Design a protein with these regions (language model features):
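Conserved alpha/beta-domain cores
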Residues: 1-201
């Protein structure tokens, strides 16, 4: 949004700074979040788009997840009411390690491949000097995905994957399917290619 940068803090590393869930309960962002909640309520209640799902991004801890949900409730967005579902972006190692604790508060997760990869192996995906280390075949990264799918599904939580990797690699698609992923989300321009890849398995 034009002018938005005027209200952003100057951070050395914004990728792990004030982003995602940490904004939603902050006094510095509460009015903007209230507007976001009003827009969601309008879409669901007035326009009858009850299939609209709330997704909480970059949520670092279960206690933070609880706080965001409580803040949403003050703005009239209550999980389970009028079929409202709440999903979590699973893109931080803590989302995987504490999956059993997050799972009681949410209905689904979407594994964010790009952030989960860079935060698992400590690689800045925007750094040209170490970009070669950002490999989706990395064992730690694959284990994180496997752990996330297994634990969340054990707790009755739907698990999806979003990111470019399934579009670029048939092998990665097969890995996700073998791990019993529920859904794979891709950008519109990648949809046909991904469907073709899945059809080859």
């Amino acid at each position: 949004m034009i002018g938005g940068e005027l209200y952003e803090p100057d951070e050395e590393n914004p990728m792990i700074g004030w982003r995602g869930a940490s904004r939603y309960y902050s006094d510095d962002y509460k009015y903007a979040f209230e507007l976001e909640c009003e827009a969601i309520k309008y879409a669901r209640d007035v326009m009858k788009m009850t299939n609209v799902i709330v997704m909480i991004p970059f949520c670092r801890t279960p206690s933070e997840c609880k706080l965001v949900i409580e803040t949403m409730e003050t703005h009239g967005l209550i999980r389970g009411e009028n079929e409202l579902r709440i999903f979590l972006m699973c893109e931080i190692p803590s989302n995987v390690i504490e999956a059993d604790l997050f799972s009681h508060m949410i209905d689904g997760v979407s594994i964010g491949g790009n952030d989960l990869l860079q935060l698992t192996i400590g690689v800045d995906r925007d750094s040209e000097k170490i970009a070669y280390l950002s490999d989706d075949k990395n064992i730690s990264y694959r284990r994180m995905i496997s752990m996330a799918i297994k634990t969340y599904k054990e707790h009755g939580v739907k698990v999806g994957f979003c990111g470019q990797q399934p579009s670029d690699s048939i092998e990665f698609c097969k890995f996700l399917i073998d791990e019993n992923i529920d859904t794979i989300s891709v950008t519109p321009d990648s949809a046909l290619k991904t469907i073709q890849n899945l059809g080859k398995l």
